[in-house]
């Protein structure tokens, strides 16, 4: 039985040797043929040479190198495209997702699950701000989007070959893999685990990238941000109508003069701000349509392992 580990890497020269050694020395994986697909996402350090050297000595290492930094989501998709295992497991190279969890994922899969999620039962290794913003994101996404995604589940999971083949059929270029992996469906099971500290290096995923990923997730699987502006427009129009009616009554019945310049200026600025925000939301969706319409490849591989 063949198990493929899909491992995106970006400037991870310190972590790759530790990860590789840990996988190869882990006794519970010895009964399986474990393929390791490294996807080098345009690294500037020695990452490419390290994974190429591993491939020379180990035929089960598949090194893929992008021509530039395309991002983690395209890297994951590339890994799924090139993984040949009966089951495929995306996993981070920093070993925060422990190798010891993999046998439990395989056990659930062999029991009949198409996808086995690895759920973090403890996020104490993450900062308070990251934990809180992740909690808000999951709640917002699951409130307005379909399908819902399991809270505290990252890319670490096991997928059957059937699930992987279904994912590979999807044509979109704007990728939010957590949503895509939930969208394909199938019988799903969960294994809980405690996330560890990084074994080496530092995280390359900063707050700005997380923010953009959150926007990608919401706009890829929900039209609610567009719909909400219809409601905001109705609300503003209703308030404006009521205020206009009040000014007429106040002038005709009570004889009070109409307040001029200040109220007019505030109204114009308020409506201008609302319109700009609405245009910005609309622009996010139009931009994604524009990118999809070009039909560019999700990634470009510089070199592949020579058979």
UniProtKB/Swiss-Prot annotation:
Keyword Iron-sulfur: no
Enzyme class at the top of the EC tree: transferase
Membrane topology: Multi-pass membrane protein
Pfam families referenced in this protein's UniProt entry, alphabetically: Glycos_transf_2
Domain of life assignment: Viruses
Keyword Flavoprotein annotated: no
MF term (GO), any: glycosyltransferase activity
Disulfide bonds: none
Gene Ontology CC: host cell membrane; plasma membrane
Main location: host cell
Transmembrane segments: 229-249, 263-283
UniProt-annotated location(s): Host membrane
Keyword terms of this UniProt record: Glycosyltransferase, Host membrane, Membrane, Transferase, Transmembrane, Transmembrane helix
EC number: 2.4.1.-
InterPro entries according to UniProt: Glyco_trans_2-like, Glycosyltransferase_2, Nucleotide-diphossugar_trans
Family named by the database record: Belongs to the glycosyltransferase 2 family. GtrB subfamily.
Reported function: Involved in O antigen modification. Catalyzes the transfer of the glucose residue from UDP-glucose to a lipid carrier.
Protein name according to UniProt: Bactoprenol glucosyl transferase
Lineage: Viruses, Duplodnaviria, Heunggongvirae, Uroviricota, Caudoviricetes
């Amino acid at each position: 039985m063949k198990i493929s580990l899909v491992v995106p890497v970006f400037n991870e020269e310190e972590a790759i040797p530790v990860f590789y050694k840990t996988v190869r020395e882990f006794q519970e994986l010895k009964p399986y043929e474990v393929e390791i697909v490294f996807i080098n996402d345009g690294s500037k350090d020695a990452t490419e040479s390290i994974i190429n050297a591993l491939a020379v000595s180990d035929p089960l290492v598949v090194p893929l190198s992008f021509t530039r930094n395309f991002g983690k989501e395209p890297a994951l998709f590339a890994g799924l495209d090139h993984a040949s295992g009966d089951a495929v497991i995306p996993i981070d190279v920093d070993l925060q997702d422990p190798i010891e969890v993999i046998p439990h994922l395989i056990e659930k899969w062999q029991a009949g699950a198409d996808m086995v999620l690895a759920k973090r039962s403890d996020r104490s290794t993450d900062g308070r701000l990251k934990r809180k913003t992740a909690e808000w994101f999951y709640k917002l996404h699951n409130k307005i989007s379909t399908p819902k995604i399991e809270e505290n589940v990252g890319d670490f999971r096991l997928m059957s070959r059937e699930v992987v083949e279904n994912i590979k059929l999807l044509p979109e270029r704007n990728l939010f893999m957590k949503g895509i992996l939930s969208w394909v469906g199938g019988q799903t099971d969960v294994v809980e685990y405690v996330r560890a500290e990084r074994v080496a290096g530092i995280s390359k995923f900063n707050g700005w990238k997380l923010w953009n990923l959150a926007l990608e997730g919401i706009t890829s699987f929900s039209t609610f941000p567009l719909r909400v502006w219809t409601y905001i427009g109705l609300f503003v129009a209703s308030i404006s109508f009521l205020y206009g009616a009040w000014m007429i009554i106040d002038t005709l019945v009570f004889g009070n003069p109409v307040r001029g310049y200040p109220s007019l200026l505030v109204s114009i600025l308020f409506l201008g701000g609302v319109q700009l925000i609405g245009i910005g939301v609309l622009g996010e969706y139009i931009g994604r349509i524009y990118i999809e319409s070009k039909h560019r490849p999700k990634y470009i591989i510089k070199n592949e392992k020579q058979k």
